[in-house]
C-alpha cells in the first residue's frame, strides 16, 4: 500500500514468497537437501553384520563387504562393514568379489522401491491408479515340479514323501551348490535389496524372515505380503529365523543332480533357508514361506491353514477353505464382517491369526462392481504383476490375457477398509469347506459331523471344466489334501488330526458349501446363484442353520436343511433340481467313486491317537 512520508511515497511490498538463496553450490547438494535424512535407526550399521553373515559363502565362511545405501546416490559414501571373519579367511579364500563392496538397500519404503524399480527394469510402470505394474519374466506362475526339499535323517522321518506328496527330495550337497550359485550372483551385484520382516500376527508365535533379492519389485512385493516391522522392531531384529535368497534372474544348472530345468526352488529346513534360481515369479517367495510355516507351526502345536478368515461384530470367527474358483476370497470378503485374512492362517491356543501382512489377489476380469475392495486397493504401493495397460493412459485392462491369465495384485491388508488390525481373532465358530461341484450333485449346504468334516478336509475336493478349445465338456474332479496339498510338509492326516482336536476342544461346527452347479452338471444345469450362497453363509454366521430341520442324502449321507430364509427350498436337495433322475443317480455314483479312489491313499494312515476317529473318518465317505 502506498503512503505519503515527507513528500516521498513508500510502498509495503508483499514478499511472502521471497526467500534467501539456497545453501547449495551444486545440483547434487540441492538434491541432498531435498531428501530429509531418515531416522538414525535406519542409518545404523547394526543390521549389516547380520546381513553379511546371511550372504556368507559356505566355502569361504565369510560374507561380502557391505555398505548401506544406493551406489548411485551422490555424496560421501557410508562407512563399509566387513564380516568379522573376513580378515582371517581372506588369505586362504581371496577372490575378486572380496575386493568389491555390495550396497545393501535395507527395508526401503514403497516410494524408494518405486524409484529403484524404474531405474532397474524397463518393464516397470506406474498405472493410472498409482500401482506399480511389472513383469515376472518367462515364468508367470509357480513351478511346483521344480521345487525341492532337502531330505536328511530328520526330514526323511518327519515329512510326507511319495505318491501325492508335493515334496520332491534333494540332498544337502546339491542344496549348498545351488546356494553358492545364488550367493555368487547376488554378491556380484552392485546392490541387493534386503527386507527383514515377520510372519504371523500372533506376537507369541511370529517368525522373523529375511528376504535378499536382486529386484526392487520383489522387495516391494514382500514388503506388502509380510508383516511390516516398526523402526524399534528393526533395531532389535537380530538374526532371522528363516532366509530367502532370491537369485531368480540367474538360472540353475539344469545338468546338476536333482535338477530338471533351469528353474529351481530349494528349501533346507535344517538350515532354515530357501534358494530361488531361474524364476522371477514373486509368488514363489510367498508360497515357499507358507510351506515353511506348515512345518514350523505344527511343531508348536499350532495348526497352519490354507483358508480365508473373517469375524462378525459379535466376535464370531469363520474359516473358509476352498481351492481356486470356489469363492473363498469372495465369500470371506464381507462388508458386514471384518477381514482377518484371505489366504494363510494359524489356529493356536490363543485363537486365529493371519500369517501374512497383505493380500495376493487374482486380477483377471477384475471389475469395480464385482470386487470393489480389491479394485480400490490397487493404488500407490500395490504391485500389479503381468497385467496389460493402455500405453498412453496407463489404464489397466483386466480382461486382457495376452501375458497370462494369472495376473495378480499384491497389497498391504490395510488397503482393505474392513480389515481387522491386528489380524487376530478368537477361536473359530464355524469351519466352512467350499466346493465348486461342476457335477451338480452336492447340496448347496450340508451340516457335517466331525468325521465328515475331516473326510472332506482331507479330500479337498472341487471340480473344474476343461477348456472349450479342446471340445471337452466333461467336468474334471480335483482333489487337493487339506485344500492346499501343494504347500503342506507333513502327511495330510497330521493336519486333520490337529483340526479335529481343535474342533472337539472348542465345540465348532463344520459345513460343506457347494458354490458350483445345480439341476445338472456343467453344460446342463446352472451355477448356484451367488446371492443364494451369500444367504446360506449368512445363515451359518447367524446360527440360523443350527436350529433348522435336516434330512439325510443318499450315498454321501449329508445332512441338508429343509429351508433357509431367502433361498428356494427346492434347490436345497439336489435331486429335486434334476429333471432326469436316472442321470442324477448315475452322476452321483460317479462322483462318489472318484472320492473313494482318491481316499485310498489315506486309508492306511492313523489319524491322531484315536483309532475310533480314524474308523469314523473312513466310514464318513460315500456309501454305495
Curated annotation (Swiss-Prot):
Q: Which InterPro entries match?
A: PEP_carboxykinase_ATP, PEP_carboxykinase_C, PEP_carboxykinase_N, PEPCK_ATP_CS
- What is the reaction catalyzed? oxaloacetate + ATP = phosphoenolpyruvate + ADP + CO2
> Which amino acids does the record list as binding ATP?
322-329
Q: What is its EC number?
A: 4.1.1.49
Q: Tell where it localizes.
A: Cytoplasm
Q: Which Pfam families match?
A: PEPCK_ATP
Gene Ontology cellular-component annotations: cytosol
Q: Which GO terms describe its molecular function?
A: ATP binding; phosphoenolpyruvate carboxykinase (ATP) activity
- Family annotation (PROSITE patterns): PEPCK_ATP
Q: Assembly and partners?
A: Homohexamer.
Q: Which family does it belong to?
A: Belongs to the phosphoenolpyruvate carboxykinase (ATP) family.
- Its recorded name reads Phosphoenolpyruvate carboxykinase (ATP) 1
> What is the originating organism of this protein?
Urochloa panicoides
What taxonomic ancestry is recorded? Eukaryota, Viridiplantae, Streptophyta, Embryophyta, Tracheophyta
Gene giving rise to this polypeptide: PCK1
